[in-house]
């Protein structure tokens, strides 16, 4: 029984419960903060206003919608 307890203590020290994301950490629970961090695609520096989309090379950097 002491071996099982020692194993449990070692596991809790290596993988604390605080490392697991809690429900309050989800971005869906904080829509105001999520909207402040969200950049509109029209305001993205790599957005092509004449074609109304981003070149395919810039899509890797988070620019959407993509022109293919």
UniProtKB/Swiss-Prot annotation:
Pfam families, alphabetized: Conotoxin (PF02950)
Tissues where the protein occurs: Expressed by the venom duct. Both hydroxylated and non-hydroxylated forms are mostly and only present in part 2 (proximal of the venom bulb) of the venom duct, respectively.
Cellular localization per UniProt: Secreted
Residues with PTM 4-hydroxyproline: 65
Chief location: secreted
Lineage top rank: taxon: Eukaryota
Signal peptide feature range: 1-19
Annotated propeptide span(s): 20-50
GO cellular component entries: extracellular region
Keywords, ordered alphabetically: Cleavage on pair of basic residues, Disulfide bond, Hydroxylation, Secreted, Signal, Toxin
GO molecular function: ion channel inhibitor activity; toxin activity
Disulfide linkage: 53-67, 54-63, 59-66
Protein modification: Contains 3 disulfide bonds.
Record remark: domains: The cysteine framework is III (CC-C-C-CC).
Family: Belongs to the conotoxin M superfamily.
Name under which the protein is recorded: TxMMSK-03
Lineage: Eukaryota, Metazoa, Spiralia, Lophotrochozoa, Mollusca
């Amino acid at each position: 029984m002491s071996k099982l307890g020692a194993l449990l203590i070692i596991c809790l020290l290596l993988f604390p419960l605080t490392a697991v994301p809690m429900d309050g950490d989800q971005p869906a629970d904080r829509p105001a903060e999520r909207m402040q961090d969200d950049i509109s695609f029209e305001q993205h520096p790599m957005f092509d206003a004449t074609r109304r989309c981003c070149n395919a090379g810039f899509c890797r950097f988070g620019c959407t919608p993509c022109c293919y």
